[in-house]
């Protein structure tokens, strides 16, 4: 099954919305100076020109938002740190053979365009008019998707939530609040190495306490996050966005629940370091009526005897035969689908809630009209095509609450383990910064 109860989704569109790492075309027209290496990452390198291009783009974004930039040295350090983590994960993905095909990339780009109320062609034209390279934007989105798939394979696929855990969670105060409130949190992280010496821990603790003192004296949380945080959202002022209360990591949820709007926490210790949270805002939570989709699909997977390209061609052939009326969808799924859970039922997945499936599947499901066949598309599980048989609005039932609770626990566990995993991979890698 590709159901999210087995595979936690790391919100892809959240990553895509952050794909602001486009390279302005005009920056390429500058006189080319002698390039140099600013960081060695295992067997790869980050060049000064790459870093400068990224900094130029982020500086433009700050300017457009009317935000104050940190000092050039701090901005350079923050951007380079982000690029190092990206490069490490892309190297891991390449070794694991993780790729994103053109069809999946185009579907993701179309989703971004729809979010901006544009067609894909209009969206591309708008970017070009604003001086950005469409080719480089596409490549950045592809890299974001590759990293997301790597994280799914390396972290999310190991997470299993038991019925007993769900029962305990639903009966807890936090579980009850999950259906009542959403939190928007700000975050500052003072990183501590995984095998830190006592002196390093003391220095990090002292730095976190100094930040608290500055906040208490009236300093701006967003500016401190940009200048001092080691977190992945530092350049967004530490803003982690909105989530249901229970979808935050346990450490965050339990300490944020009593914060009023505008308040911040004391330093919180985790394996990654010291965290400071700010309650940017809080509001009422999930709606009681949800849209559900009755879906069937066919999955064709690559294996030891079938290459990814052969699996794709097989999926396309079966899709075209169903579309031409040469085959029935149900019989095709029963005979050929590599998803045994649904194949025996003619590919039927039953009623599916928005947010329940992996991103690539959900995106296609939401954009396929009732009764029509979707294009062939790729997810981390293989090649699919699907049909939406019906759509309905349903009251939030006990079953749906359990599904929401399972997703919340998965997302929480994923965030906790992802942070540790990224830090471990960086510790295991050779990184030489040459700023």
UniProtKB/Swiss-Prot annotation:
Subcellular location(s) of the protein = Periplasm
Secretion signal span: 1-29
Main subcellular localization, coarse class? periplasm
Q: Report the GO terms under cellular component.
A: outer membrane-bounded periplasmic space
For this UniProt record, the keywords arranged alphabetically read as follows: Chaperone, Isomerase, Periplasm, Repeat, Rotamase, Signal
Decide whether keyword Repeat is in the record.
yes
Q: Which reaction does it catalyse?
A: [protein]-peptidylproline (omega=180) = [protein]-peptidylproline (omega=0)
Q: Which cysteines are joined by disulfide bonds?
A: none
Query: Which PROSITE patterns does UniProt cross-reference here?
Result: PPIC_PPIASE_2
Give the transmembrane region(s): none
Q: Which GO terms describe its biological process?
A: Gram-negative-bacterium-type cell outer membrane assembly; protein folding; protein stabilization
What molecular function does GO assign, one term?
peptide binding
Where does the record place the PpiC domain? 180-281, 290-390
Q: What is its EC number?
A: 5.2.1.8
Q: Does the keyword NADP apply?
A: no
Q: What does the record give as the function of this protein?
A: Chaperone involved in the correct folding and assembly of outer membrane proteins. Recognizes specific patterns of aromatic residues and the orientation of their side chains, which are found more frequently in integral outer membrane proteins. May act in both early periplasmic and late outer membrane-associated steps of protein maturation.
In the record's own words, the domains note is:
The PPIase activity resides only in the second parvulin domain. The N-terminal region and the C-terminal tail are necessary and sufficient for the chaperone activity of SurA. The PPIase activity is dispensable for SurA to function as a chaperone. The N-terminal region and the C-terminal tail are also required for porin recognition.
Protein name per the record: Chaperone SurA
- Whose protein is this, by species? Alcanivorax borkumensis (strain ATCC 700651 / DSM 11573 / NCIMB 13689 / SK2)
């Amino acid at each position: 099954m590709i159901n999210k109860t087995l595979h936690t989704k790391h919100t892809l569109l959240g990553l895509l919305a952050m794909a602001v790492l486009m390279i302005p075309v005009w920056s390429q027209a500058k006189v080319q100076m002698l390039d140099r290496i600013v960081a060695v990452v295992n067997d790869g390198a980050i060049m000064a020109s790459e870093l400068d291009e990224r900094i130029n783009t982020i500086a433009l974004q700050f300017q457009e938002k009317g935000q104050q930039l940190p000092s050039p040295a701090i901005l350079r350090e923050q951007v380079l740190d982000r690029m190092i983590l990206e490069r490490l994960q892309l190297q891991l993905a390449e070794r694991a053979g993780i790729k994103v095909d053109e069809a999946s990339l185009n579907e993701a780009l179309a989703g971004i365009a729809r979010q901006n109320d544009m067609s894909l062609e209009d969206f591309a034209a708008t970017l070009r008019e604003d001086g950005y390279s469409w080719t480089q934007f596409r490549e950045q989105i592809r890299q974001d998707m590759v990293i997301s798939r790597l994280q799914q394979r390396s972290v999310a696929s190991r997470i299993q939530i038991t019925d007993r855990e769900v029962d305990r969670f639903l009966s807890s105060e936090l579980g009850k609040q999950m259906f009542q409130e959403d939190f928007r949190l700000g975050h500052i992280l003072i990183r501590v190495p995984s095998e830190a010496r006592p002196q390093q821990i003391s220095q990090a603790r002292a730095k976190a306490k100094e930040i608290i003192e500055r906040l208490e004296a009236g300093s701006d949380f967003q500016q401190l996050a940009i200048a001092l945080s080691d977190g992945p959202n530092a350049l967004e002022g530490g803003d982690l966005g909105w989530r249901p209360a229970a979808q935050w990591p346990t450490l965050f949820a339990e300490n944020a629940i009593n914060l009023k709007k505008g308040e911040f926490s004391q330093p919180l210790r985790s394996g990654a370091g010291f965290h400071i949270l700010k309650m940017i805002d809080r509001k009422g939570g999930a709606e009681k009526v949800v849209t559900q989709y009755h879906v069937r699909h066919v999955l064709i997977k690559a294996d030891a005897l079938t290459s990814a390209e052969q699996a794709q061609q097989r999926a396309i052939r079966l899709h075209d035969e169903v579309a031409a009326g040469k085959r029935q969808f149900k019989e095709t799924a029963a005979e050929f689908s590599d998803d045994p859970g649904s194949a025996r039922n003619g590919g039927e997945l039953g009623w599916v809630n928005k947010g329940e499936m992996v991103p690539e599947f959900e995106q296609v499901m939401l954009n396929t009209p009732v009764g029509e066949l979707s294009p062939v598309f790729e997810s981390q599980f293989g090649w699919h095509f699907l049909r939406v048989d019906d759509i309905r609005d349903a009251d939030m039932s006990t079953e749906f609450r359990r599904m929401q609770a399972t997703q919340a626990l998965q997302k929480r566990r994923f965030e906790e383990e992802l942070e540790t995993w990224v830090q471990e991979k960086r510790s295991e890698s050779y990184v030489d910064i040459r700023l």
